[in-house]
From Swiss-Prot:
Keyword Oxidoreductase: yes
Keywords, sorted A to Z: 4Fe-4S, Iron, Iron-sulfur, Isoprene biosynthesis, Metal-binding, Oxidoreductase
PANTHER family listed in its UniProt record: 4-HYDROXY-3-METHYLBUT-2-ENYL DIPHOSPHATE REDUCTASE (PTHR30426:SF0)
Annotated family: Belongs to the IspH family.
GO biological process: dimethylallyl diphosphate biosynthetic process; isopentenyl diphosphate biosynthetic process, methylerythritol 4-phosphate pathway; terpenoid biosynthetic process
Stated name of the protein: 4-hydroxy-3-methylbut-2-enyl diphosphate reductase
Annotated positions binding isopentenyl diphosphate: H41, H74, H124, S226, S227, N228, S270
Keyword 4Fe-4S: yes
Catalytic activity: isopentenyl diphosphate + 2 oxidized [2Fe-2S]-[ferredoxin] + H2O = (2E)-4-hydroxy-3-methylbut-2-enyl diphosphate + 2 reduced [2Fe-2S]-[ferredoxin] + 2 H(+); dimethylallyl diphosphate + 2 oxidized [2Fe-2S]-[ferredoxin] + H2O = (2E)-4-hydroxy-3-methylbut-2-enyl diphosphate + 2 reduced [2Fe-2S]-[ferredoxin] + 2 H(+)
Pathway: Isoprenoid biosynthesis; dimethylallyl diphosphate biosynthesis; dimethylallyl diphosphate from (2E)-4-hydroxy-3-methylbutenyl diphosphate: step 1/1; Isoprenoid biosynthesis; isopentenyl diphosphate biosynthesis via DXP pathway; isopentenyl diphosphate from 1-deoxy-D-xylulose 5-phosphate: step 6/6
Organism from which the protein derives: Acinetobacter baylyi (strain ATCC 33305 / BD413 / ADP1)
Binding site for dimethylallyl diphosphate: H41, H74, H124, S226, S227, N228, S270
GO molecular function: 4 iron, 4 sulfur cluster binding; 4-hydroxy-3-methylbut-2-enyl diphosphate reductase activity; metal ion binding
Length: 316
């Protein structure tokens, strides 16, 4: 059996930054450090940070007064930001800058009284945060749609003053269809020059297309609550290949590879490389050859840490 590695795969700049913020806060201020929601959607990463002293909570009312709290990479609503400020909590915001860009767009539309439509998955923390950035006090409204059927059923108050934004981790193909449906139904709708799907999501989906075209089975390393990891698995399946989402090597099942010549391996944007290496090792234990890595788009994007953490680290 051959192992073929997708490129790029794994951590993106926003995930790197979010994990670094938690680690540096733990180094600079000592545990406990509170984190609202999983800082990134990966069990291995969250368990590691928990062992180091991070305490993950669902809401701010679980955070004691005079504590440090970190907002996850997925972003939060204005109400959460205001609650933290009102309580005087020390906040480090690990929201991915590409999610913040969408928040800025939504805030601008609300200020102008333009109604907004968010394309995204209901219940996802990023969607909850983005929806909560829209201030309805100017008379506008924000709507959520997930697919073309939602667009068909949608009624808005002001179709002449309407804009759309997207969750950053969606399927590129599915999102294009939803945007087409929106433009057909609401010809005057505004939108970003390019959809809000992030560079890492785009690159990893392109890499999986290449991978699936060459392999019999595709393994996606990622947690089941990771949106971008699920989209990678779905994309490989749409290309007619068996595809499996696994958190780690222990979830592999040897019968998946009966009669298989080429196994493709990739990882979602929140999955660390160590998990990929463990999956490769397990496959080699079962007789696979050393992996070959495909050529792919080079990523050199980095996002800076909050100034106080940079200063603290420099002083240390």
């Amino acid at each position: 059996m051959e192992i073929v590695l997708a490129n790029p795969r794994g951590f993106c700049a926003g995930v790197d930054r979010a994990i670094a913020i938690v680690n540096r806060a733990l180094e600079c201020f000592n545990p406990p450090i509170y984190v609202r929601h999983e800082v990134v959607h990966n069990k291995f990463v969250v368990d590691d940070l928990r062992q180091r002293g991070a305490i993950f909570v669902d809401e701010l009312d679980q955070v004691p007064d005079d504590s440090i709290v970190i907002f996850s990479a997925h972003g939060v609503s204005k109400a959460v930001q205001q609650e933290a400020e009102h309580r005087g909590l020390k906040v480090f915001d690990a929201t991915c800058p590409l999610v913040t860009k969408v928040h800025i767009e939504v805030t601008k539309y609300a200020r102008e009284g333009t109604e907004a439509i968010l394309i995204g998955h209901e219940g996802h923390p990023e969607v909850e945060g983005t929806m909560g950035q829209y201030d309805k006090s100017k008379g506008g409204h924000i709507y959520l749609v997930e697919d073309e059927a939602d667009v068909e059923a949608l009624a808005v108050n002001h179709p002449e003053k309407l804009a759309f934004v997207t969750q950053t981790t969606l399927s590129i193909d599915d999102t294009a269809k939803v945007i087409d449906a929106l433009r057909t139904k609401f010809p005057q709708i505004q939108g970003p020059r390019k959809d809000d799907i992030c560079y890492a999501t785009q690159n990893r989906q392109d890499a999986v297309r290449d991978l699936a075209s060459r392999c019999d089975v595709v393994l996606v390393v990622g947690s089941p609550n990771s949106s971008n990891s699920n989209r990678l698995r779905e994309l490989a399946e749409r290309m007619g290949k068996a595809a499996y989402l696994v958190d780690n090597a222990d979830q592999l099942e040897q019968q998946w590879f009966d009669g298989v010549a080429k196994i493709g391996v990739t990882a979602g944007a929140s999955a660390p490389e160590i998990l990929i290496k463990q999956v490769i090792q397990r496959l080699q234990d079962w007789g696979a050859e050393a992996p070959k890595e495909l050529d792919g788009r080079e990523e050199n994007i980095t996002f800076s840490l909050p100034k106080e953490l940079r200063i603290q680290v420099t002083q240390a």
